[in-house]
Amino acid sequence: IDGMPVGVMDLFDTQDMPTRLNSAIFADRQAHQDAACVYAMRTHGAAIIGKTATTEFGLATPPGTRNPYDYARSPGGASSGSAAAVGARMLPTALGAQAMGSLVQPSGYCANYAFKPSFGAINRGGGHFPCPSATHVGVHSGTLRDAWELCWFLSRTAGPDAGHTAIAGSPQPAEARKPHRLVRMFTPGWELTPQS
């Protein structure tokens, strides 16, 4: 974590940058302390590069974020700013959150890895989420190793939410193994997909 450049989704408080929730009514909102996971990263040497755009309140009005691979296509949902920054290789990793598909959908659209740990495995304190009873804190990353190591670190350092358990296992991800077999499944609509 020490020296790692990190982006922070604009739903997490940062003491040195405004937390606007992508809403005009919070244009001047400044938190007095970092969110728990931001504090953990900062105190262990991460370089908080800036805030990444989100949908308004993490819900509706999309930000001006563009898909780094095709400007005509969507970058995804609420964590799209984090996904686009990592997908464009501006950052190796960025903090995000998901209640429905806001981590995994943008990662698929912007060609990066998303890791969404179990609910409550990473402390949500200082995050402003539209659905706190369903929102998971997670990350976007350019590599599986960075995604796993950052989530594991946050879970162990910022701690889990009260009543929840931290991520188990080693701080390093398991080694990749060749699968016994692969399956390719064609779902309805596959034939409509351009072959290019």
Please report, for each region that a protein language model flagged, where it lies by residue.
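Short acidic, glycine/serine/threonine-rich loops at helix termini
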Residues: 19, 59-62, 104-109, 126-127, ...
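Gly/Ser-rich catalytic/binding loops embedded in alpha/beta enzyme cores
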Residues: 1-100, 180
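A short helix-breaking turn/cap at a secondary-structure junction
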Residues: 116-196
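Glycine/threonine-rich beta-strand-loop-alpha-helix active-site module
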Residues: 99-126
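Flexible loop/turn segments at secondary-structure boundaries
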Residues: 56-58, 101-104, 136, 190-192
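Conserved active-site and cofactor/substrate-binding residues in soluble primary-metabolism enzymes
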Residues: 32-36, 80, 97, 107-110, ...
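Short, mixed-charge, low-aromatic patches
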Residues: 39-43, 101-110, 154-162
